[in-house]
Amino acid sequence: MVAAAASSAFFSFPTPGTSPKPGKFGNWPSSLSIPFNPKSNHNGGIQVKANASAHPKANGSAVSLKAGSLETQEDTSSPSPPPRTFISQLPDWSMLVSAITTVFVAAEKQWTMLDRKSKRPDVLVEPFVQDGVSFRQSFSIRSYEIGVDRTASIETLMNIFQETSLNHCKSLGLLNDGFGRTPEMCKRDLIWVVTKMQIEVNRYPTWGDTIEVTTWVSESGKNGMSRDWLISDCHSGEILIRATSVWAMMNQKTRRLSKIPDEVRQEIVPYFVDSAPVIEDDRKLHKLDVKTGDSIRNGLTPRWNDFDVNQHVNNVKYIAWLLKSVPTEVFETQELCGLTLEYRRECRRDSVLESVTAMDPSKEGDRSLYQHLLRLENGADIALGRTEWRPKNAGATGAVSTGKTSNGNSVS
């Protein structure tokens, strides 16, 4: 009805007494037109013309009305197209609306994904620039990264240090096809190996905490590089952990230490920071006598997944081996708050190691000291270490003692 009304609005009404004119196709119009003169009321005459569209065929015959009589004739001509009206000439709005809806749904989905990704606490955040060389990244402590105390393990922290180091190199464009290797290092088959690691723990992050790691590099002697890390609580800004390390270059084929070539030095020196290490502990490590060790763990061997892409045992594994010989009662009553580790020799695939631990008689307040030795069964030293331990919860002012994570979530 709406279409008929809209169509009739485009046709003029005849004046009174006007007879119908022949249609477009002579005396055989394609529509049925019935003019009539209704009765006029006292207000004046009103002329009305009714137009009713009819199908051009009825049982195969054309139908028309001429001079008050109904005549039929077999349709021998081709069928005429349906009349063009205002409605029939409108575009198909349903297709346009469908296309617009599809575009908006896709855009909304993409925006939702980007918005969700930006709110994840463990993704790579935009690195801040401090003299163009510092790097910052956030992490969320997950359930499989904690121990029985709901705190992150020392291995978790070491893995975080390694991850931020590689991402720092990547952000500077120094990461080539190797594991932390620059283009010039790859040409000369050189890799980085850590020679010393020091860690100080004020408080361990707990399950659900979001931490922020800041790292930078500086020069260490003529043929070394040092890297420092600071771990802070994203919620309070409290410095939780400090760590510093010294690195040297080793030839991947000969497995011997190497000087830093001038070409490599030109790649890395522009990103060095002129600053002192965050930990300055010059105390020397004493070599243990295996016979006087308090605890020994034998038969330690590297597994296939202990090696990195440079075919080098990951430095995190050395710390795990070192702690294998620490008595269980130490872990039950104390927590590790300080670590110094010096790497002396590389561990090979077929190496068999033993871990030795001895308690140091000297004490620093309520802290206990332990000396460590990691060596091959043939007697060659792999690493020397010293650890400091304090009573549990002595340094905990966060989730363990308050019952809440840095995000305000309960850990009970």
UniProtKB/Swiss-Prot annotation:
Active site positions, chain numbering: N310, H312, C347
Gene Ontology molecular function terms on file: acyl carrier activity; fatty acyl-[ACP] hydrolase activity
Cellular component terms per the entry's GO annotation: chloroplast
Compositional bias per record (Low complexity), positions renumbered to this chain: 1-25
Enzyme Commission number(s) of this protein: 3.1.2.-
Reaction catalyzed: tetradecanoyl-[ACP] + H2O = tetradecanoate + holo-[ACP] + H(+)
SUPFAM superfamilies in the record: Thioesterase/thiol ester dehydrase-isomerase
Presequence boundaries: 1-50
Superkingdom in the source lineage: Eukaryota
Intracellular or extracellular location(s): Plastid, Chloroplast
Major localization class: plastid
Major enzyme class: hydrolase
Region (Disordered): 1-63, 393-412
Keywords from the UniProt entry: Chloroplast, Fatty acid biosynthesis, Fatty acid metabolism, Hydrolase, Lipid biosynthesis, Lipid metabolism, Plastid, Transit peptide
InterPro entries: Acyl-ACP-thioesterase_N, Acyl-ACP_TE_C, Acyl-ACP_thioesterase_NHD, FATA/B, HotDog_dom_sf
Comp. bias intervals (Polar residues): 28-44, 399-412
Function in brief: Plays an essential role in chain termination during de novo fatty acid synthesis. Possesses thioesterase activity for medium chain acyl-ACPs. Main substrate is 14:0.
UniProt record similarity statement: Belongs to the acyl-ACP thioesterase family.
This protein's name: Acyl-[acyl-carrier-protein] hydrolase FATB3, chloroplastic
Organism of this sequence: Cuphea viscosissima (Blue waxweed)
Species lineage: Eukaryota, Viridiplantae, Streptophyta, Embryophyta, Tracheophyta
